[in-house]
Regions:
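Pore-lining transmembrane helices
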Residues: 2-362
């Protein structure tokens, strides 16, 4: 059976492309990294090694998932989708090739000798992965339906152009991201107070904009201490906006902003940016307390997630109860108190109004 679906005929604006691609990338990270980590947390609690490896498999599929996400959000057919999957995997710089033979074992215990040059998948980095996947989709969608040779021409052109783009970008972006990660780590050592405050505030801002805080944390491969600061900063937004507006919204809306994403408050912040002050202040205050006083740190895979789907707290609870306790105290309780107090101050000063955080279905 051949693929007959064509690319959409309506013209998309740059804003549409940014929104659609960002949404797809965020969902890819949520499923591959977030659910992958969640499965590993369950596996650790259940002492089930095979399930833990399933979580690992989910995480290393992040590169190809970017391509599928972009193609899906831009309404591509399957020929273009698979081309984007290949291109984004190349762009992620996620596949290594062994220099000698080795024995491999699957999650089910099947063993097989792997010859030299066997591929080894890793998570990779999202910058050039997303770019390569997007290029493949744009090329594929443009060519779809223009010739009688779609079955051959579309995937060949999309894969070739996307993969070459991925190779070129990965050669530049991977070293650059490694350098940026080292720079952030060094700045944290030079001035842990200002460093943790800056990282926490930056990732809190990323979370509340259309950008993906989780993708950016993965992109720069934050060091453990910076990741801890970023996690506190993003968690403060989940907690802060929920406690400030829980009386203004119904249960569903509070669940949406409390454990899915506070990004739903973005339209309200455009109306009155001062609403963001309490959670942002909480992020700046709590991050150095966590990282300096309690030596809180975590992996970059959790850094930008906040309370999304409760992945971070469940992962911390299953791996280190001490860090989980610090996270709950400094990342949840303290930001809630700070945000609520400052919100009442803003109300008293008439800087904000009582119903400006109400979420509406549009």
């Amino acid at each position: 059976m051949t693929e007959t679906t064509t690319a959409p005929t309506h013209k998309m604006t740059t804003k549409d492309y940014v929104y659609q691609v960002s949404a797809g990338v965020s969902n890819a990270i949520l499923v591959c990294l977030g659910i992958g980590l969640l499965l590993q947390s369950f596996a650790t609690m259940l002492h089930w090694s095979a399930l833990y490896q399933v979580g690992t498999i989910a995480q290393v599929l992040l590169g190809p998932a970017f391509g599928v996400a972009i193609a899906t959000m831009l309404h591509s057919n399957t020929l273009v989708t698979f081309s984007a999957m290949i291109s984004s995997t190349v762009g992620a710089n996620a596949v290594f090739f062994s220099q000698s033979s080795t024995n491999g074992v699957t999650a089910t215990g099947h063993t097989l000798a792997q010859a030299a040059q066997s591929s080894i998948f890793t998570t990779g980095q999202p910058i050039s992965a997303v770019a390569a996947g997007l290029v493949a989709v744009l090329v594929g969608n443009y060519l779809t339906g223009k010739t009688p040779l779609d079955m051959m021409l579309v995937p060949l052109a999309a894969t070739f152009v996307g993969a070459v783009t991925g190779l070129g970008l990965a050669a530049v972006t991977t070293p650059a991201l490694v350098w940026l990660s080292q720079f952030i780590a060094a700045s944290m050592k030079v001035n842990p107070l200002l460093g943790s405050m800056a990282v926490s505030l930056a990732w809190a801002l990323f979370l509340m904009t259309p950008a993906s805080s989780a993708a950016l944390a993965v992109a720069v491969m934050l060091d453990p201490v910076s990741s801890g600061a970023a996690l506190i900063g993003t968690t403060a937004q989940f907690v802060g906006f929920t406690v400030m507006s829980y009386r203004q919204n119904n249960l569903g809306a509070n669940i949406a902003q409390g454990i899915i994403t506070p990004k739903v408050q973005f339209p309200n912040l455009l109306v009155n940016p001062r609403l963001a002050i309490p959670p942002m202040v909480a992020a700046v205050v709590c991050a150095p307390i966590a990282t300096i006083v309690f030596n809180f740190s975590t992996t970059y895979k959790l850094a930008g997630l906040g309370l999304n789907s409760l992945i971070a707290p469940l992962t911390l609870a299953s791996t280190n109860l001490g860090r989980f306790g610090v996270f709950m105290l400094v990342g949840v309780v303290l930001p809630a108190v700070i945000s609520l107090v400052l919100y009442r101050v803003l109300l008293a000063a008439n800087w904000v109004e009582s119903q400006q955080l109400q979420l509406e279905i549009v």
